[in-house]
Regions:
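The Walker A (P-loop) glycine that initiates the GxxxxGKT/S ATP-binding motif of P-loop NTPases
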Residues: 167-168
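N-terminal accessory targeting/assembly segments
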Residues: 1-103, 107-112
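P-loop NTPase nucleotide-binding/switch module
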Residues: 83, 112-161, 176-179, 213-224
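Conserved P-loop
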Residues: 176-215
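Conserved lysine of the Walker
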Residues: 173
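Single conserved hydrophobic/aromatic residue that forms the stacking wall/gate
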Residues: 224-236
Length: 236
């Protein structure tokens, strides 16, 4: 009887079919779908062909009557009424690991300069993480050497401190950031280039950052021509 009960539980918990939804409306920057069953922040794929090879990644951001409201992460070109929608059942995550160093990723963590399958990334990390408890934050007390004497000597930066660099175009903001990335005592740099032009990205990586800085950096690219929904997601 115990074996029969175990088999029954296996059958009861098994998944024997998959529910899909269909795109019903595209309104502004959002897509409305009839089904599938979903909850807020679930990651969904909107397929652009019957073979379900090409798809647009999207996130459940709300509900309206019997519709699911989706916010796409990619360009919505090709999305139309009737496109199949599949729910992955989990929120958006990004692959992380030491082999990500020296590479560039897009606004939602996809590797852009090689095939992600060639990298041995340790785990998946959710992008929606609760903020740390204010009382658990360390007090800023240690100096973070940035390797630029004028900054280290006159406007010393502490570990964990936020700073802003404000200046007009072409006066050296990117050059200064590149100097920080190459010379800082930090083990890893995460550099987000948001709203940059394509040529400016290559100039920063090759000239300002250089091979030495890039070797211990991960560069997040959110170029000026990307779809609007992706940009605020990355900035947040």
């Amino acid at each position: 009887m115990l074996e029969v009960a175990q088999k029954y539980l296996q059958l009861k918990s098994g998944e024997y079919y998959k529910c899909f939804g269909k795109v019903d409306k595209v309104v502004g920057l959002t897509i409305e779908s009839i089904g599938p069953k979903a909850k807020l922040n679930d990651l969904c794929m909107i397929f652009l062909d019957k073979e379900r090879r090409d798809y647009v990644m999207s996130e459940v951001v709300g509900f309206k009557d019997s519709h699911i409201i989706l916010m796409p992460f990619d360009n919505v070109e090709g999305v139309g009424v009737g496109c199949i929608v599949e729910n992955t059942g989990h929120p958006l995550t990004v692959a992380v690991g030491d082999e990500l160093l020296g590479h560039t990723v897009d606004g939602i963590g996809r590797v852009t300069d090689c095939d992600e399958k060639d990298l041995e990334l340790d785990s998946e990390y959710p992008i929606e993480a609760p903020p740390p408890d204010p009382m658990s934050r360390e007090i800023i007390s240690d100096v973070l050497p940035l390797g630029v004497k004028a900054v280290d000597g006159l406007i010393t930066v502490g570990k964990g401190q936020r700073i802003g660099i404000f200046a007009g175009s072409g006066v050296g903001k990117s050059t200064l950031l590149g100097m920080f990335a190459r010379n800082t005592k930090a083990d890893i740099n995460v550099i987000a280039l948001i709203g940059e032009r394509g040529r400016e990205v290559r100039e920063f990586i090759e000239r300002d950052l250089g091979p030495e800085g890039m070797a211990r950096s991960v560069v997040v690219l959110s170029l000026i021509h990307i779809s609007e929904p992706t940009r605020p997601r990355l900035i947040s």
